[in-house]
A protein has these predicted regions:
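Extended, Lys/Arg-rich, non-catalytic nucleic-acid recognition/anchoring regions
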Residues: 2-4, 8, 45
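Fold-level signature of zinc-dependent metallopeptidase catalytic domains
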Residues: 11-170
Length: 170
């Protein structure tokens, strides 16, 4: 990273330390590749399947969500991810739970950057914030309607429960 910064590759270092990239060696340096590009074949196959499912979907909100999610997989655009998530959030009465999400977990590599005080100070001076890499998670399930209804009842009572807690006045 220091070698790349010395060579004036600030933008590439910023991309390498972002959540959305795969990192590969490129000669003496490293190269960041957005995961929509790196996994373009796999994402394209998934997007095609989602678009096919949208064609047969009878629920308009679900159909819209599938279309937006397919586009999010094909584009190097975080806003598309957010738009797909917004369409999913609008669907409250669906019998299916279908989620494609980016999850960010602490990895073992990113914290090592903070152990090198010279490097982290240099990154801070350049306004580069290291971020752990994202993972994609896909989940499909059938909604437990009774369990969901019970959780919604608890949700409605959360303020009341909070007032019953010790030190609720803080």
């Amino acid at each position: 990273i220091n070698l790349m910064l010395d060579a004036g590759q600030k933008n590439e270092v910023k991309n390498i330390l972002s959540a959305r990239t795969m990192v590969r060696r490129n000669g003496d340096f490293l190269k960041a590749i957005d995961y929509t590009e790196y996994f373009s074949n796999e994402f394209s196959e998934i997007a095609n399947e989602l678009e096919c499912a949208a064609h047969f979907a009878t629920d308009d909100l679900f159909k819209d969500f599938l279309g937006w999610q397919a586009q999010a997989l094909l584009q190097n655009n975080e806003e598309m991810d957010i738009l797909a998530d917004k369409h999913w959030a609008r669907m409250q009465n669906t019998p299916l739970e279908f989620t494609i999400s980016r999850e960010n977990y602490e990895d073992k590599l990113t914290p090592t950057l903070f152990e090198n005080t010279n490097l982290i100070n240099r990154l801070n001076e350049l306004n580069i914030s290291p971020v752990p890499k994202d993972m994609l998670g896909i989940r499909v399930g059938i909604v437990n309607k009774k369990g969901t209804d019970l959780l919604l009842k608890f949700k409605d009572k959360m303020k009341e429960f909070a007032n019953l807690m010790p030190k609720s006045d803080l």
